[in-house]
């Protein structure tokens, strides 16, 4: 998105889970407002403050909004499985017998030590995805299957990477005191020494643990041994939690309480005194029904004692390979109710509010209160109890993480954006493009749509000839069509105009085309029936995506061929994709439970006569170009620091004196990105270079100018996206008048502007790459940034690749709008060429992403070669994000994967996403 999300979720029921509220804090007929990833309002919709009236509105259809679910106790990162132990237990072996036979935790230790960090991440992601699919937004992940320093660190790093791979918050817990590794030969004291003197200091130094845990049980560690670990954790200022009283009562609950632990978990054998101690200390009881069920325990945790004492209770999956291979918090809630006799309210609070409390993050999440993170789960249920009582049923409609609606494994898109034709902002259009959300026209516009349709019906029934209603098309406009043939005329129009060639446009482009067509028709000047509108809306909601070939439009009279293919699917002809399968239009509609529409007078013409394909392609290019432009400022700052360049050219007054807004914004961004760099401070004095080359010194002037024309193109395209562009139009006085709004010249010019900006951003980025690999220009860096030049070629050919991509973009940047050719027997004798002018932007921005990705690799490596000097805090975050995907270059290696990964980090917004808010310039100035 171009800016932080500002969204109002309307027509909802909200379970706030506020602590003192009864009945889950349920509010009927409610609204929830998100701004900058935080909740700013949660209450009755009829009391919604006026200040939020301009925010984007999403109609939740009376669905239930709860806090995002939180799994507060998992061992999600593990290698392999222990299915053989499951078979042993079925034969009667106890937990202790399995452990003493070399199984249990020690078995998982062997597997984890043999796995790489990448292996662990790869194996864990499907388990995490299963949780996410049920509305989970926060997951705690414990180590404890490495049991040596390197393996425990590897496990925790893999856990942290999960939060980079998926849109979910990860809390990591160091569980070194989980079991005694076999190499210790039974010497628990020596192993605890290693935990507190070797593992914990290294983990604390790297900031890898949000908490420290231990397993207090006879088969693991006794209370005095756990106390040593907790004392060490306290010295490192890390909170603690404890596996306690699962198989016997060693008074682990009381021990946890005495240290003010965040939680004590399992607790089957906890007594009333332990429950009271936990309540007094504020230690949460985390109950794990999956383990209780899986190993067929007979002693239940004392839920009644916890209630009586006022101990807070949470629920968690305890996902682990041996005793609870469970990846469903919904099933966990059901188990909590049926096995432990918890109430519905206790179960739901146990995976939201109390789970957040158990992780020490209740001030951030877990309830729907003002100021907290906008982590939400939206459910298609009538009663909250349905979350608890059903088994194997997932009613999740949408998951919202940090204010952004995130896709999940279900294919149906359930959230709907409500569009107000004529005033749909760029932010909403980008959300439709990037997130694939379905849309609907605001019902307030239906009356105008129906009024225009009624007027067209009157004209069709009359005697006067009106273009496209009772005449032929284009050069055949003089031919009168009989009233009985009007429907056939519209159908023939669609079929005859399906002349597209080439590969299908991508789903996100087609969705945007359909949304733009809704906006245009929704203005009430096109004369289509409401049935046409509702079919497009239903196709977007159900996922019926017409197959539109990429080529065939000259950008006037509208995008005829592409939009004819869109309309063909609507009438049961042509082809469409449904859930990824390419089908006939009729079959795709049928599988989605939809029926083809029979087009009435003018409807076929209204659907195909418009600029929506060109505009959608240009908008996609704009959104991609803007993200790349923001990232180019980051990589430009990296390159400047790597080359020990000066930040003096970025001084604010220089840019204020010239006055261009883009230049001012670009200069400010570069200046802020470099702020605090030790590399820069190291050459403030005594640097004999007077000026840097233009590619570093003139970044604000070049990238700022590019930003300005992107913003100009954005204004043009926002207007066009809200325009009525078919022909003829039903005017406010009821007349149907022919005009030329279908001519896409404004879109063609905007596409050319974007192409020029993309070309120039890549050109100056490529010159910075060339500077860094040239030892005569890079101020002390080795040739091609190779650590052993000659033996290694370093980034030599990566720079060549960037040059090739730059040159290709120069060729494609030639203006498309200066071309024209007459068509339709010279009736349509000047055309815009907007469609292919916009379509080329997809390839150009892909090339630009690759160039900037190469600059990221080059700049990051150059900065690393300046060690022990360090770059700024902002740029260090960028390097860390890059290194999470691409290791630093020590020796020559296969480079194509590195370049691909770096380009993806540019394209998906990862690199720009780590920069603090407010530094990088927005598209809407």
From Swiss-Prot:
Described purpose of this protein according to its UniProt entry: Catalyzes the hydrolytic cleavage of the carbon-nitrogen bond in imidazolone-5-propanoate to yield N-formimidoyl-L-glutamate. It is the third step in the universal histidine degradation pathway.
Keyword NAD part of the UniProt annotation: no
Post-translational modification: Contains an active site 4-methylidene-imidazol-5-one (MIO), which is formed autocatalytically by cyclization and dehydration of residues Ala-Ser-Gly.
Main localization, broad class: cytoplasm
Keywords linked to the UniProt accession: Cytoplasm, Histidine metabolism, Hydrolase, Iron, Lyase, Metal-binding, Multifunctional enzyme, Zinc
Pathway note: Amino-acid degradation; L-histidine degradation into L-glutamate; N-formimidoyl-L-glutamate from L-histidine: step 1/3; Amino-acid degradation; L-histidine degradation into L-glutamate; N-formimidoyl-L-glutamate from L-histidine: step 3/3
Protein family membership: In the N-terminal section; belongs to the metallo-dependent hydrolases superfamily. HutI family. In the C-terminal section; belongs to the PAL/histidase family.
Location of cross-link 5-imidazolinone (Ala-Gly): 556-558
Positions with a binding annotation for Fe(3+): 73, 75, 243, 318
Gene: hutIH
Binding site for Zn(2+): 73, 75, 243, 318
PANTHER family xref list: IMIDAZOLONEPROPIONASE (PTHR42752), IMIDAZOLONEPROPIONASE-RELATED (PTHR42752:SF1)
Annotated segments matching region Imidazolonepropionase: 1-414
Residues with the 2,3-didehydroalanine (Ser) modification: 557
CDD domains (UniProt xref): Imidazolone-5PH (cd01296), PAL-HAL (cd00332)
UniProt cross-references to Pfam families, sorted A to Z: Amidohydro_1, Lyase_aromatic
Protein known as: Bifunctional imidazolonepropionase/histidine ammonia-lyase
GO CC annotations on file: cytoplasm
Superkingdom per UniProt: Bacteria
GO MF term list: histidine ammonia-lyase activity; imidazolonepropionase activity; iron ion binding; zinc ion binding
Gene Ontology biological-process annotations: L-histidine catabolic process to glutamate and formamide; L-histidine catabolic process to glutamate and formate
Cofactor: Zn(2+); Fe(3+)
Catalytic activity, as annotated: 4-imidazolone-5-propanoate + H2O = N-formimidoyl-L-glutamate; L-histidine = trans-urocanate + NH4(+)
Residues given in the record as 4-imidazolone-5-propanoate binding sites: 82, 145, 178, 246, 323
EC number assigned by the record: 3.5.2.7, 4.3.1.3
Cofactor details (free text): Binds 1 zinc or iron ion per subunit.
Compartment annotation: Cytoplasm
């Amino acid at each position: 998105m171009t800016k932080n999300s500002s969204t109002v979720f309307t027509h909802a029921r909200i379970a706030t889970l506020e602590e003192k509220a009864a009945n889950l804090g349920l509010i009927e007929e409610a609204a929830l407002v998100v701004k900058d990833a935080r909740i700013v309002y949660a209450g009755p919709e009829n009391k919604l403050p006026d200040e939020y009236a301009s925010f984007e509105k999403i109609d939740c259809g009376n669905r239930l909004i709860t806090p995002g679910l939180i799994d507060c106790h998992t061992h999600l990162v593990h290698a392999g499985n222990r299915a053989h132990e499951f078979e042993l237990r079925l034969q009667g072996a106890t937990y202790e017998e399995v452990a003493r036979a070399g199984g249990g935790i020690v078995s998982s230790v062997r597997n984890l030590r043999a796995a790489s960090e990448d292996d662990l991440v790869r194996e864990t992601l499907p388990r995490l995805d299963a949780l996410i699919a049920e509305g989970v937004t926060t997951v705690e992940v414990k180590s404890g299957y490495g049991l040596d320093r390197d393996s425990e660190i590897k496990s925790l790093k893999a856990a942290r990477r999960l939060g980079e791979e998926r849109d979910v918050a990860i809390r990591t817990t160091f569980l070194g005191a989980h079991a005694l590794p076999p190499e210790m030969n039974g010497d628990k004291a020596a192993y605890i020494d290693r935990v507190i003197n070797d593992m914990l200091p290294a983990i604390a130094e790297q900031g890898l643990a949000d908490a420290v845990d231990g397993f207090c049980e006879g088969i693991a560690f006794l209370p005095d041994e756990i106390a040593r670990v907790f004392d060490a954790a306290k010295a490192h200022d890390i909170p603690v939690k404890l596996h306690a009283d699962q198989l016997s009562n060693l008074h682990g609950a009381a021990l946890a309480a005495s240290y003010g632990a965040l939680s004590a978990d399992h607790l089957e054998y906890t007594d009333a005194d332990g429950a009271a101690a936990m309540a007094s200390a504020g230690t949460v009881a985390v109950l794990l029904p999956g383990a209780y069920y899986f190993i067929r325990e007979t002693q239940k945790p004392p839920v009644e004692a916890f209630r009586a004492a006022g101990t807070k209770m949470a629920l968690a999956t305890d996902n682990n390979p041996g005793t609870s291979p469970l990846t469903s918090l919904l099933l966990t809630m059901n188990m909590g109710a049926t096995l432990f006799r918890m109430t519905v309210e206790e179960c739901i609070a146990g995976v939201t509010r109390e789970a957040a409390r158990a992780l020490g993050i209740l001030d951030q999440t877990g309830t729907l209160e003002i100021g907290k993170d906008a982590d939400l789960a939206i459910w298609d249920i009538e009663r909250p109890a349905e979350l608890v009582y059903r088994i194997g049923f997932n009613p999740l409609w949408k998951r919202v993480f940090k204010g952004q609606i995130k896709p999940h494994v279900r294919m149906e898109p359930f959230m709907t954006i409500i569009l107000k034709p004529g005033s749909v902002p760029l932010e909403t259009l980008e959300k439709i493009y990037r997130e694939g959300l379905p849309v609907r026209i605001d019902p307030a516009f239906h009356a105008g749509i129906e009024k225009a349709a009624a007027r067209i019906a009157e004209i069709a029934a009359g005697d006067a000839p009106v273009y496209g209603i009772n005449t032929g098309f284009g050069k055949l406009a003089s031919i009168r069509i009989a009233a009985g043939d009007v429907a056939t005329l519209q159908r023939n129009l669609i079929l005859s105009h399906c002349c597209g060639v080439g590969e299908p446009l991508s789903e996100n482009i087609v969705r945007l085309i359909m949304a733009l067509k809704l906006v245009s028709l929704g203005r009430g000047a096109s004369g289509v029936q409401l049935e046409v509108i509702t079919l497009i809306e239903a196709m977007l909601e159900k996922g019926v995506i017409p197959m539109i070939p990429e080529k065939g439009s000259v950008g006037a009279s509208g995008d005829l061929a592409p939009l004819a293919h869109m309309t063909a699917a609507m009438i049961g002809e042509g082809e469409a994709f449904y859930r990824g399968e390419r089908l006939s239009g009729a079959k795709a509609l049928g599988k989605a439970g939809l029926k083809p529409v029979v087009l009435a007078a003018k409807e076929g013409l209204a659907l195909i006569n418009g600029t929506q394909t060109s505009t959608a392609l240009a908008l996609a290019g704009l959104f991609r170009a803007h993200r790349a432009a923001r990232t180019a400022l980051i990589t430009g700052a990296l390159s400047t620091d790597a080359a020990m360049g000066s930040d003096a050219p970025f001084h604010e007054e220089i840019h204020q004196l010239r006055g261009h807004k883009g230049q001012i914004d670009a200069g400010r961004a570069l200046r802020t990105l470099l702020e605090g760099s030790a590399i820069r401070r190291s050459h403030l004095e005594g640097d004999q270079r007077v000026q840097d080359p233009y590619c570093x010194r003139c970044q604000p002037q070049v990238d700022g100018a590019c930003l300005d024309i992107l913003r100009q193109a954005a204004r043009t395209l926002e207007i066009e996206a809200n325009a009525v562009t078919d022909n003829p139009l039903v005017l406010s006085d009821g007349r149907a008048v022919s005009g030329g709004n279908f001519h896409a010249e404004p879109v063609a010019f905007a596409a050319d502007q974007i192409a020029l900006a993309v070309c120039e951003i890549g050109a100056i980025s490529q010159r910075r790459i060339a500077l860094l690999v040239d030892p005569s220009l890079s101020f002390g860096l080795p040739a091609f940034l190779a650590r052993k030049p000659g033996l290694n070629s370093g980034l030599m050919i990566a720079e060549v690749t960037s040059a090739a991509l730059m040159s290709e973009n120069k060729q494609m940047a030639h203006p498309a709008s200066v071309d024209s050719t007459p068509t339709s027997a010279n009736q349509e004798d000047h055309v815009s060429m907007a469609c292919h002018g916009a379509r080329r932007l997809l390839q150009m921005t892909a090339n630009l992403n690759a160039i900037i990705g190469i600059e990221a690799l080059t700049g990051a490596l150059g900065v690393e070669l300046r060690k022990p000097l360090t770059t700024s805090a902002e740029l260090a975050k960028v390097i860390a994000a890059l290194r999470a995907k691409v290791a630093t270059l020590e020796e020559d290696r296969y480079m194509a994967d590195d370049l691909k990964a770096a380009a993806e980090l540019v394209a998906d917004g990862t690199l720009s996403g780590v920069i603090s808010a407010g530094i990088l310039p927005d598209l809407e100035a």
